């Protein structure tokens, strides 16, 4: 069971990462929206290459030396954008992992029920009371039944009825 769960978890996690990477490329503006400055630089990159990629790169490098090289090649920018998604993927991972622990929690609950720990205690208490009840219950009815008919006059009625058919 554990192997199956682990394999399923790995498959789900890997597929989630693949989806995150695909989504990260599509959601580039959303990821970049975290920083207003980065949006402006990216806009410059987008506008710059069509006008003249060489001119836009030096200007971007002059504006921000750190961001300049990263902005120059759009591929590197893509890697940076992919960087934030992995953190997003990580938070998504724990929820999935968190989902797996509940099933184990359900399993421990199951074994006690299957183990019958609750059942034997239930059966044991029920056993003695039932036995005691049977012992106490049956004795009163038998004495009550024989005692009941005689006072009613069943004896006098019985003999005449028995004699008449004979």
UniProtKB/Swiss-Prot annotation:
Residue list for modification Pyrrolidone carboxylic acid: 17
Cited function: PRP's act as highly potent inhibitors of crystal growth of calcium phosphates. They provide a protective and reparative environment for dental enamel which is important for the integrity of the teeth.
Protein name: Salivary acidic proline-rich phosphoprotein 1/2
SMART domains: Pro-rich
Entry-listed glycosylation sites: 33, 38
Keyword tags: Cleavage on pair of basic residues, Glycoprotein, Phosphoprotein, Pyrrolidone carboxylic acid, Repeat, Secreted, Signal
Biased composition range(s): Pro residues: 83-111, 137-159
Low complexity composition-biased segments: 48-61, 68-82
Post-translational modification: Proteolytically cleaved; PRP-2, PRP-1, PIF-S and Db-S yield PRP-4, PRP-3 (protein A), PIF-F and Db-F, respectively. A hexuronic acid was shown to be linked to Ser-33 in about 40% of the polypeptides. Neither the structure of the carbohydrate (whether glucuronic acid or an isomer of), nor the linkage (whether a glycoside or an ester) has been definitely established.
Outcome reported for the amino acid change (mutating residue 42 to L): In allele PRH1-PA and allele PRH1-DB
Organism, scientific name: Homo sapiens
Superkingdom as given in the UniProt entry: Eukaryota
């Amino acid at each position: 069971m554990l192997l199956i769960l682990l394999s399923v978890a790995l498959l789900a996690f890997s597929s989630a990462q693949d989806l995150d990477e695909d989504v990260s490329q599509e959601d580039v503006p959303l990821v970049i929206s975290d920083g207003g400055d980065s949006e402006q630089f990216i806009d410059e990159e987008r506008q710059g290459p069509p006008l003249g990629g060489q001119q836009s790169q030096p200007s971007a490098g002059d504006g921000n030396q750190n961001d300049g090289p990263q902005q120059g090649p759009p591929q590197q920018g893509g890697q940076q954008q992919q960087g934030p998604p992995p953190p997003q993927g990580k938070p998504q991972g724990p929820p999935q992992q968190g989902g797996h622990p509940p099933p184990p929690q359900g399993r421990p609950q199951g074994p006690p029920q299957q183990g019958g720990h609750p059942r034997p205690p239930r059966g044991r208490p029920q056993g003695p009371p039932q036995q005691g009840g049977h012992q106490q219950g049956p004795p009163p009815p038998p004495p009550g039944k024989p005692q009941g008919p005689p006072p009613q006059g069943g004896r006098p009625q019985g003999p005449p009825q028995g004699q008449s058919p004979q």
